[in-house]
Amino acid sequence: EAAGARPVVVRRATDLGNAPGDRLDGLVIPGGESTTMSTLLTSFDMLLPLRELIAAGLPAYGSCAGMILLADRVEGAEEGQALLGGIDMTVRRNAFGRQVDSYEEDLIAPGLGAGKDRPLHAVFIRAPWVESVGPGVEILATTRTGRAAGVSGVDGGRIVAVRHGALLATSFHPEV
């Protein structure tokens, strides 16, 4: 609301509308536990309608578990874990470790307007990282250390923020 948007809570498939802009101008998929979120999306018959809206161009942002749900491929997924997909990337669940391994770091994030004089501070809580991206996926931020998934031309370490068309995903929690 502070940014001028009018948030709408989505609890049921009827809250989604039939097309982008019908009821929603965009979607924020928060952090949480991705397998539980996947189970609930399936139980409440929201998985297919959300997939269709995303495929039709609904802008969406996913943080942490939201990143996992927006990925086309996941390493370490639970058996039967459903994804929304949409971003041509492979993510690794809980890549930075368990809850006790949560940490904070200043990122290399020129794609998010941050630079050496203005780093982007990020909080990682049981976070995924991006193992690889497909063509057309823009890498927006990396950690300062670690292997950048062998992606040529990528400075820094692990990939932690990407954009693919109208979809944006971060492995960190910007709200913290």
Where are these regions (language model features)?
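Beta-strand->loop->alpha-helix junctions that form or flank phosphate-binding loops
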Residues: 8-14, 140-145, 158-163
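Flexible gly/pro-rich beta->alpha loop and the following alpha-helix that scaffold active-site loops
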Residues: 2-62, 68-75
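A glycine-centered loop/beta-turn motif at secondary-structure junctions
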Residues: 148-176
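Pocket-forming structural segment of enzyme catalytic cores
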Residues: 75-155
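Structural motif
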Residues: 28-30, 124, 169-171
